[in-house]
Structures are given as C-alpha cells and as structure tokens.
C-alpha cells in the first residue's frame, strides 16, 4: 500500500505539471479554440480533427480529465491514510480539489462563452495553486510512509525569513499573473530587445509595450529579492538544510526563468523556451509553497519563539 500511494502521488504530480505546461502550450500556439466553442466535445466529436490546434486543445482537455481522476483518488487516500498523521493534509486536499475544478471550469467557460485577458490570466495562476497543493501532498505521502527521519522537519525559522517566504510567495503569484497577462494580450513580442523595449532605451510607446515592460520590471524585482533571501539563508541557516539548499535551488530556478524569458524574446517565441519559462516558474512556486509548509510546521510544533 505504501508503494502504491507513493507511486500515485508521483504520477499525479507529474500529470498536474503536464496540465500546467499544456495550458501554456495552448496559449502559445493559439489553440484555445482548436475544438471550436464546444466542450467537452471537439467540433461535435469525441476525437479531434487531425490538425495541430485541435490535437493540442483536445490533449489538454484529456490531461485535465485524467488529472481530475488522479487528484480525487489521491485526495481520498490521503484523507484516510495521511490526515491522521499530518494535520495539514486535509487543507491541502481541499485546496487541490477546489483549484483543480476552478481551473477546469474557467477553461470550459472561456471556450464556450469567450473571456477577456484579465480573467484568462487567472487560469494559469489557479492551476499553479492546484499543482503546488498536489506537490505538497506528495511530500507528505513520502514523509508519512517513511520510518526514518522526517522529510519535513520542524525548523527554527526567524521572523525575517518568514517575511521573505510569505512576501515572495505572494509577489511571485503577482508576477505569474503579469506573465500570463502578457501572453493573453499577445504582448510577448511587443518589445523586441532586452532589457529595454527599444535599442535607444525609449519609454514604451503603446499598451502592449507597457504590459511587457511592467512584467519585466516585476520579474527583475523578484529576481533580486530571491537572491537577497538566498544570501540570508546561506548566512543564518547553514545547519537547516531544507532552507539552505531550498533557497539555492530557488535562485537557480529564477535564473533559468530569466534566461528562458530573454531567449523567448530573441528567438521570436521559440516553443521550447516559452514552455521552459512556464516550467521553471511552476517549480519555483512549488519550492516557495514547501517553505510555507515548513513555517506552518514550525509554528505548530515549536513552543518557544525563535530568537
């Protein structure tokens, strides 16, 4: 049973990541209406027509359907087997289900009735929360089925580190929204050079350029903030390996995220760079959510405040 639960948690997390990347693929390739304004059918049929847009949209719908079944199965088993061990299990189960259903509903409504960029930019963010919830459930599954040292130990986490973690997870979500808004307003190539919008460094001239440059400015602050948090962890948390290495991983991910973003511009939105951009931010958000789990464990299990 332990092996089966672990395997299910890994497969579910992987499929949720596919759903995230698949949604980005749908947006990048303009395949949102590849099946017309019908849901769940594709142009009145279960199987799509043999053209790229229909296949991409249909595959995304199928992966969402598979992920729903897997998440529900994992949720039931975690509720029964893991929640008696870890109190946070029920919260994560509820979050994973609610946000998975929300993202599926939002996607279906957008297909049938249409939507605007402000609303559709939420679609990726909602999926991101569901993915992170499933990822944390998978960590709890592995922790609960181990007989040795805990994977998620209660740590001493100071107020400054808590500020970095809570602030960064909130701000990262905002940056994710601005990035999704860039995609849905078709502003990805509004500025053809980097770091400025034009070679002469002039201010943005129209709406799409302002959208693109706003995202770049927000992403730059995120990049700097994560490195500040990493240096703080390296100085004060050398003995607490989850935080020490977690922040190093975060710095690597935000660097790869920045590189993939720049290369997306210079490659004229080459699909590989564009999808990598979504992949790295998903992983980064997952790491930050893991930090939040560490804080929750620390606050619950520590009797004295960390000085």
From Swiss-Prot:
Pathway in which the depicted protein is active: Porphyrin-containing compound metabolism; heme A biosynthesis; heme A from heme O: step 1/1
Extracellular topological intervals: 28-65, 114-121, 183-216, 264-274
Complex and partners: Interacts with CtaB.
Protein topology in the membrane: Multi-pass membrane protein
Native organism taxonomy: Bacteria, Bacillati, Bacillota, Bacilli, Bacillales
GO cellular component: plasma membrane
Predominant subcellular localization, coarse grouping: membrane
UniProt record similarity statement: Belongs to the COX15/CtaA family. Type 1 subfamily.
One of the GO biological process terms: heme A biosynthetic process
Cofactor (UniProt): heme b
One Pfam entry name: COX15-CtaA
Transmembrane domains' residue ranges: 7-27, 66-86, 93-113, 122-142, 162-182, 217-237, 243-263, 275-295
Described function: Catalyzes the conversion of heme O to heme A by two successive hydroxylations of the methyl group at C8. The first hydroxylation forms heme I, the second hydroxylation results in an unstable dihydroxymethyl group, which spontaneously dehydrates, resulting in the formyl group of heme A.
Active site residues per record: 57
Residue numbers on the Cytoplasmic membrane side: 1-6, 87-92, 143-161, 238-242, 296-307
GO molecular function per UniProt: metal ion binding; oxidoreductase activity, acting on NAD(P)H, heme protein as acceptor
Record flagged with keyword Cell membrane: yes
Enzyme Commission number(s) of this protein: 1.17.99.9
Annotated residues for binding of heme b: 215, 277
Disulphide bridges, residue numbers: 35-42, 191-197
Descriptive protein name: Heme A synthase
């Amino acid at each position: 049973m332990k092996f089966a639960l672990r395997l299910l948690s890994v497969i579910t997390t992987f499929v949720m990541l596919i759903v995230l990347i698949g949604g980005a693929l749908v947006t990048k390739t303009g395949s949102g209406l590849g099946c017309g304004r019908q849901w769940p059918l594709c142009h009145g049929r279960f199987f799509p027509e043999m053209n790229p847009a229909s296949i991409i949209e249909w595959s995304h719908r199928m992966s969402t359907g598979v992920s729903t079944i897997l998440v529900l199965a994992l949720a039931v088993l975690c509720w029964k087997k893991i929640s008696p061990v870890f109190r946070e299990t029920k919260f994560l189960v509820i979050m994973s289900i609610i946000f998975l259903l929300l993202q599926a509903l939002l996607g279906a409504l957008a297909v049938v009735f249409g939507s605007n960029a402000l609303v559709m930019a939420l679609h990726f963010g909602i999926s991101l929360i569901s993915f992170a919830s499933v990822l944390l459930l998978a960590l709890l599954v592995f922790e609960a089925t181990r007989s040795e040292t805990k994977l998620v130990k209660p740590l001493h986490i100071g107020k400054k580190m808590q500020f970095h973690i809570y602030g960064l997870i909130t701000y990262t979500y905002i940056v994710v929204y601005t990035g999704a808004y860039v995609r849905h307003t078709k502003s990805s190539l509004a500025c053809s050079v980097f770091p400025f919008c034009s070679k002469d460094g002039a201010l943005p001239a129209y709406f799409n350029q302002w959208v693109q440059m706003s995202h770049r400015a927000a992403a730059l602050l995120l990049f700097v903030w994560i490195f500040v948090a990493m240096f703080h962890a390296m100085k004060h948390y050398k003995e607490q390996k989850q935080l020490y290495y977690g922040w190093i991983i975060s710095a690597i991910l935000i660097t790869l995220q920045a590189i993939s973003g720049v290369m997306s511009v210079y490659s004229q939105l080459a699909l590989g760079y564009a999808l990598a951009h979504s992949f790295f931010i998903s992983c980064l958000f997952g790491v930050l959510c893991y930090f939040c789990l560490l804080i929750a464990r620390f606050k619950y299990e520590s009797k004295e405040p960390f000085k």
